[in-house]
């Protein structure tokens, strides 16, 4: 059962920047899930298995489709996922990585582990402040 979650919508708003959905599921399913959760409008684009010509994560080909389409520098992107093999692929391409998982030790290729996506704004802004010495208003690690 899917539910609308105010904390998730609030976190997506606070993150700012360009947000993309990259899913191995079919487009119609992804759109239905995002709609049911009330969060579709917070994403700039949705990339489904069809969008990547059936090259699912963790294939680098799918990541390249997104990065080319949006002219993204991988070193200025954060990839959030719950699957370690997808995070490992993203890290090899130069993206910062966030693993959504319970209390498990994180591998070296994971930059940040959170229990919930709703924690992202707090962690990303804190990390950016430590890295630059000044408050961050948006952007990846």
Please name every model-derived segment.
Residues 13, 26-27, 32-141:
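Asp-based, Mg2+/Mn2+-dependent phosphohydrolase catalytic module
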Residues 1-21, 27, 31, 60:
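Short, acidic loop-to-helix structural element flanking the phosphoryl-transfer center
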């Amino acid at each position: 059962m899917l539910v609308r979650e105010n904390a998730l919508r609030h976190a997506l708003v606070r993150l700012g920047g360009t947000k993309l959905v990259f899913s191995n599921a079919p487009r119609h399913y992804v759109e239905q899930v995002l709609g049911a959760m009330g969060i579709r409008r917070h994403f700039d684009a949705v990339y489904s298995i069809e969008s990547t010509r059936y090259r699912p994560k963790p294939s680098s080909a799918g990541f390249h489709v997104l990065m080319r389409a949006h002219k993204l520098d991988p070193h200025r992107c954060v990839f959030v996922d719950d699957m370690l093999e997808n995070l490992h692929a993203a890290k090899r391409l130069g993206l910062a990585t966030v693993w959504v998982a319970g209390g498990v030790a994180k591998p070296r290729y994971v930059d940040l582990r959170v229990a919930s996506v709703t924690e992202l704004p707090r962690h990303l802004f804190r990390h950016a402040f430590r890295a630059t010495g000044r408050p961050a208003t948006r952007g990846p690690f």
